[in-house]
Amino acid sequence: MRTPLVVGNWKMNGSRAANRALLESMRKEMEAGVTAEVAVCPPFVYLADMESLLQGSVINWGAQNLSHHEVGAYTGEIAPSMLADLGCRFVIVGHSERRTLYGETDSLVAEKAIVAQKVNIIPIICVGETLQEREQNITEQVVKRQLNAVLELAGVNALEKAVIAYEPIWAIGTGRTATPEQAQEVHALIRSHVAIQNSGIAEELLILYGGSVKGNNAAELLAMPDIDGGLIGGASLDAKEFLTICQAAG
């Protein structure tokens, strides 16, 4: 049985004072009872604070990105081992903002996922289509192509210690949300595509939904059989809203 996972992606938001207030409030709220696994992904500069702020809590933490290089002369980059030093359990790779704003390719995303696993960090591999691609009815081709980059580089066994996040790009930060049925259709597609190579891994694979998830739509989305949690953006910056989503997950 899959344990639901809810991950808060803070993006480029926060300050030391704001983070402390948010996490203190979040910790208190979580004590009310949440059975889903929960994690937050703050900006790099705040990762070192997470251990002290979250010590003794049920909340894990992770990073929003990493280098595909393991060490070396790469100014401004963050090595996987550095994230491991800071206690990261997860790292987001291939978020649509990284793909669209910074030109990250499918192959680069796959490389990042694999180097994360080398230091026992679980990559959250993001896939999803643009509005234009959806209107052209090529969602299936796009998502399979993105998944295949990982499968071809490392094989299906790499997904034993990975999470997939489906984020329809047209629903991120736009206020638009895929209907539960639209989201479920793509989640089922992802699981069935992996199952072609290994049905056991496919059955255990966590597939999160990310795309304007809020407290008022989380229950419907997370009730779908192949949606195992959420990758939450803006709503993760509000403790009560985030708690509502976590409770809806399990």
Swiss-Prot record:
Family: Belongs to the triosephosphate isomerase family.
Protein name: Triosephosphate isomerase
Keyword Cytoplasm appears in the UniProt entry: yes
Taxon lineage: Bacteria, Pseudomonadati, Pseudomonadota, Gammaproteobacteria, Chromatiales
Binding site for substrate: N9, W10, K11, G173, S212, G233, G234
Taxonomy, superkingdom: Bacteria
Gene transcribed to yield this protein: tpiA
Pathway, per record: Carbohydrate biosynthesis; gluconeogenesis; Carbohydrate degradation; glycolysis; D-glyceraldehyde 3-phosphate from glycerone phosphate: step 1/1
Catalytic machinery residues: H95, E167
Organism: Nitrosococcus oceani (strain ATCC 19707 / BCRC 17464 / JCM 30415 / NCIMB 11848 / C-107)
Catalytic activity: D-glyceraldehyde 3-phosphate = dihydroxyacetone phosphate
CDD domains in alphabetical order: TIM
